[in-house]
């Protein structure tokens, strides 16, 4: 059971949830995609960020594809069984025909990958040895401070991947993201909308310095509407996702990715929005508590490691079982 973008409710804690598929997803689900005998895809478009090299993707598996749009069937990956319709109806109908089964050996096969990923990626990200804040530890700290009950909104880039990996949920309908569409600037207006749609819940949006500046004027909307958006800026002074590719595949030839940033504290003040900048983990918890306790909008600028990377990563053109754990 793996989920590229549908991650809400108690799915993050369910014992059969083995993590996230995709280029920056979890190690086990990606590797075992090329080992499973049956692959059930629900509302999935089999985009290249999930499949990696198509010629080697799940060739051993019988693929069952649930979707409401017939154009998605066989578009990228050949389907053995197609089930068309609203998934609320089709899944309910199919599950009535199933008998309980226990595939413990298959479930246990994920453990070795979980242990490797924990050691090589997750622990260093959430508990870094260096002085600089990591993106992952900021995301997890906000998640825990909101008791995993907040609505998560993401922009695009490394902030999106880190949010998907380390933010947890205890309620349904808890994530708003543009998936693989690459819509930098999406986060801020989407978060404003979420506060109107669910005024009873805390809305946290994670953004990078590149994405925030693409829709910075929406701070005016927040000021005017008094939208209680909790904005977390992961500021690394780079267009981080592109910089990571330039570092890994182009010998660190950084072209148009270093950012010259304004003073976000002064900008927030100009919009009459409370704000705080943190540069050390000793400051982080107190600043997050202040953000959550503030009645209204708040901008938390976390100055994170400038050249942090999102791992694991399936290299461009590589197979899903060739994930890299380090640069």
Task: Label every PLM stretch briefly.
Residues 1-8:
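Short, small-residue-biased leader/transition segments that mark boundaries at the very start
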Residues 3, 34-35, 78:
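Alpha-helix C-terminal capping/helix-to-coil transition sites in glycosyltransferase folds
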Residues 6, 64-67, 231-234:
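Short internal beta-strands
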Residues 38, 151, 202-204:
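Structural motif
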Residues 100-114, 299:
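Flexible, glycine/charged-enriched surface loops at secondary-structure junctions
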Residues 114-189:
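Active-site diphosphate/adenylate-binding microenvironment
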